[in-house]
Amino acid sequence: MAQISESAAIPRRTANHHGNVWDDDLILSLDSPYGAPAYYERLAKLIEEMKHLLLREMEDSNHDLIRRLQIVDTLECLGIDRHFQHEIKTAALHYVYRCWNEKGIGMGSSDSGSKDLDATALGLRALRLHRYNVSSGVLENFQDENGKFFCNLTGDKRVRSMLSLLRASEISFPGEKVMQEAKAFTREYLTQVLAGSGDVTDVDQSLLREVKYALEFPWYCSAPRWEAKSFIEIYGQNQSWLKSNINQEVLELAKLDFSILQCIHQKEIQCITRWWRDSEIAQLNFYRRRHVELYFWAVTCIFEPEFSPSRIAFAKITTVGAVLDDLYDTHGTLDELKTITEAVRRWDLSLIDDLPNNIKIACQFFFNTANELAVEVVKKQGRDMTALLKATWQRYVESYLQEAEWIETRHVPSFNEYIKNALVSSGMCIVNLIPLLLLGQLLANNIVEQILSPSKIQELSELTIRLIDDIRDFEDEKERGEIASIVECYMKDNPDSTLENALNHIKGILHVSLEELNWEFMKDDSVPLCCKKFTFNIVRGLQFLYKYGDGISISNKEVKDQIFKILVDQIPIED
């Protein structure tokens, strides 16, 4: 294929991104047996059996508040709670909420005078995640006069209570001081336990595995499929837990559910791999080849089988976004980028006819994908939404052009000027639009407006994604000549600030933004929950991928292991 011969004389910057770390032939060879009808029939049978078992277990008079909450937590950790939402609410959470008061809840009956930290923390977390209105002030009942948290239990039960408190503290809203205190206290306490230097020794190994997971992957930077696979492994090694017949059946169901979903996800990544491999752009070596990593990001956001069109769209959009990012940041000249931007403004591909072939291929890749997805949206929503989609794409590329102009002139804008543009260039404007319109629900225009900019949840998701990315990448980008980052802009506005101070300030903004995003996600409004959950999980998924660095630009060992564990590695299931 023709490469860049006609533009070889033009000096071009390069980002020196590494190549594709995945063998496309390996991806295309994946073959899971769990797509067979017999496994779906077995899953449906297990779900129905489990519904009866759960109701009987949770409504048993000998198993009151704490047992109900433990069951809910187990189902959620294993990623199978979506099958039992009715049972969870009617047999567990409605009852727990009726027993809830400002003092907390006890282990036994609803009027128990002895309040329990484990039960209260489990209840706070579960009720908030299911949008019950409960105050974090209940945790103040478990603080001494010095603000330290206490637990009257000993041994593993004490560690379990502190673990529950840590996990509850992550579901925090702005201004909740007690939640911040709980998080700081429990992280320090559990870190000591894990190191063997705490006040509890000889801790159960399975419990230590749960502690390790909670410390390494807090709720706001975890991913549902990763959590499910991890807890299948944790519970599967806990022989005392497996002594219960209901736990054995729960684990069997979780394994089968994960395997069936993995089969679906494998077929989808094969679809994306063929789409990428068959495109002309796959033959060019100056654009990042991250279709596997970007599809994996989609799985971290939304994994349920019914949302396959949204996952496919998400992977295609973000892959196109990576190509545009490389084109605008490093490969294209400013004159070429102005021509491309004008072509997108007019939605007229003929305007790029005189550009070098390699750039035309990138533009054709963009237009073909954008037009293909627009057709899918029209079919799904039953009305023409191409004007909205085009306008959103146009805003997106215009923000890239602004950044390219800053690079060309070596201009560092003010912090506020940078943020205004960066919210758009984060890509959330388009990443959160098309997949959302393909979720399966018909969304009225007013609902779309509530979700998208200038809505609060959209603005916060744009901001957090930009902050996460810039905190990780600003040094690498500076080396490539991209000097306008949130860190550099802050230091320009605050010339006396050190790099450490600037990073701490920006991390503080990120922390507050994540708490505000929690609130926007949890609060009750007219936006369908699946839409808000998708928006929220885009941020969670990116934090998960950026846990060990920029997991998209640099597909390091940790990210590759994560992808392998979720998309490739099968769980052994006994027939």
Curated annotation (Swiss-Prot):
Sequence motif DDXXD motif, residues: 325-329
Sequence positions that bind Mg(2+) 2: 325, 329
InterPro entries associated with the record: Isoprenoid_synthase_dom_sf, Terpene_cyclase-like_1_C, Terpene_cyclase_plant_C1, Terpene_synth_N, Terpene_synth_N_sf, Terpene_synthase-like, Terpene_synthase_metal-bd, Terpenoid_cyclase/PrenylTrfase
Binding site for Mg(2+) 1: 325, 329
Annotated EC: 4.2.3.104
Gene Ontology molecular function: any one: magnesium ion binding
Catalytic reaction(s) noted: (2E,6E)-farnesyl diphosphate = alpha-humulene + diphosphate
Entry similarity comment: Belongs to the terpene synthase family. Tpsa subfamily.
Domains (record comment): The Asp-Asp-Xaa-Xaa-Asp/Glu (DDXXD/E) motif is important for the catalytic activity, presumably through binding to Mg(2+).
Protein name: Alpha-humulene synthase
Taxonomic source organism: Picea glauca
Lineage: Eukaryota, Viridiplantae, Streptophyta, Embryophyta, Tracheophyta
